[in-house]
Amino acid sequence: MKKFLILFLIIFAFAGSSFSQDKFAIARIWTPVLNTDDFESVFGGKSGTKVKLDGKGLIREMEFIAFPNTVFNIVNTIPKNGYDIYEVTTEDYPYTSTKLYIDSRFVNLTDTKIQDRERLLPQKEIILENLKLMEGYPYMWGGNVADGISEMMEYYKPAKELTNRTEELWKLKGVDCSGLIYQATNGNTPRNTSSLVNYGNPVEINGLSAKEIAEKLQPLDLIVWSGHVVIVLDENTAIESTPAEGVNKTDLVARLKSILIERKAVDDWNSTSGKRFVIRRWVE
């Protein structure tokens, strides 16, 4: 009896240590990260033909799309019909205001944490070219893969043929404002504007006119506030992604004038409050 008890305790201890091991997931392809574990309610719904949108036509359940080879720490596993949903954390998205979820079919599992994806910042000229190539793409809340994810049509197969626009939404085609620069830099910039307002170094603009600000700007400077970012392309042009127009170029001075109507130019985001914006220079 004593030997049996000892054997039981050894087996129990071994099993407990096995179950307590951290598990990790590695994105094998572009991996959508949502703030809900009910992916099927977003892509398909009861009819199997609709994408869940809010009153502004946005998929608010979307957080971002993880690059291939992104490493996730699995916090919890939620079984579904033929696949799992994982509650996760990742260094690529350090925002804690909501839980994050991924679909098991987009990732591979490991019990050992491996090195995260390699982050190589493209040359400045390549980043600028990447931005220009995305002109004309639609706005996608939480999107940072302009061409979308074709596997969404396989893993969440629609019940019938979709309209072109619904298929774009289903595939998560397009980028949001910070997703535009995130994709152009291969995921080397912070994903959200709440971080971009302090990213890089400040450009002093307090009290300046739109023309005076424009004269100080360099390509890839960020005109940013918590909620939106506009990216400088050259001395005359900016680019941004908006719900109304998607990815579009604008006249730099004219865009600054429109911003100054509603917001105050400040040097340091954290030094004041209210409607304001800053310029951040993160690459020379």
PLM region spans:
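Short, structured beta-strand/loop micro-motifs enriched in basic residues and often containing a Trp
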Residues: 25-57, 199-210
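Sec-dependent N-terminal signal peptides
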Residues: 4-14
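Short, surface-exposed secondary-structure edge patches
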Residues: 55-65, 211-216
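SH3/SH3-like beta-barrel superfamily modules
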Residues: 58-105
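Sec/Tat signal peptide C-region and signal peptidase I cleavage site
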Residues: 16-20
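...with weaker cross-activation on analogous glycine-rich loops/strands in unrelated enzymes
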Residues: 189-258
